[in-house]
Regions:
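A short helix->loop->beta-strand "cap" motif at the edges of active sites that frequently abuts
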Residues: 10-12, 37-39, 156
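Contiguous beta-strand/loop segments that form the cofactor/metal-binding neighborhood of enzyme cores
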Residues: 90, 109, 113-187
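Beta-loop-alpha module in the N-terminal Rossmann-like domain of NAD(P)-dependent dehydrogenases
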Residues: 1-33
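Rossmann-fold dehydrogenase core element
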Residues: 29-47, 67-70
Length: 187
């Protein structure tokens, strides 16, 4: 918000990387500023440009697999396993500072990719959720693991698991969509 606000107020269109903001309050303020100043504000989500994910979206939204019943998205990584405060890489600093990354680093850092992938491929909305968010890496003060159970707006069920504490995990983004007539998965 702090970086985008002066540009928005000058009427400059913006392409922004995630996380959008660290809090819902800041996101709501940002939306009001964008609407008031009538600018284009785009949030990047690089995975939706992958040709195989675009194909998966076509298959799912065309009805080829029938009514979506189950969706599973996971994104295991291991970049915080064994990290020590004194060994933090510069690239990790914003992620490991709650004031910058927000109350849940893992959801703002890679959870946003999992959420976007679910919405992009299925075009469904989350209507209800239950989450367990925790810190598995002892040296951290931010969350590095999250399990989220979902109910989607077509009454399908889903889950999202994201972690930076998955030893050996490296960019393991996956989505599975199970319908009444078939399934699609991208691994």
């Amino acid at each position: 918000l702090k970086i985008a606000k002066p540009f928005i107020e000058k009427g400059i269109h913006i392409i922004c990387d995630k996380p959008l903001t660290a809090t819902i309050s800041d996101a709501e303020t940002l939306k009001k500023l964008v609407d008031k100043n009538k600018i284009i504000f785009a949030l990047t989500h690089n995975y939706s440009a992958y040709p195989m994910l675009r194909e998966a979206k076509k298959i799912v939204t065309s009805g080829k697999i029938g009514k979506v019943n189950l969706v599973n998205v996971e994104y295991p990584q291991g970049y915080t396993v064994g990290i020590k405060k004194k060994d933090e890489k510069k690239t990790l600093k914003w992620r490991l500072d709650k004031r910058i990354s927000g109350p849940s680093m893992i959801l703002s850092e890679i959870g946003t990719h999992a959420y976007h992938l679910l919405r992009y491929v299925t075009e469904l909305e989350i209507s209800e959720l239950s989450a367990e968010v925790n810190t598995l890496s002892k040296e951290l003060t931010v969350d590095d693991n999250a399990f989220v159970l979902l109910r989607l707006n077509n009454n399908a069920r889903g889950s999202i698991w994201v972690s930076s504490a998955a030893t050996g995990g490296e960019n393991g983004l996956k989505i599975r969509v199970y319908g009444s007539k078939g399934a699609v998965e991208w691994l």
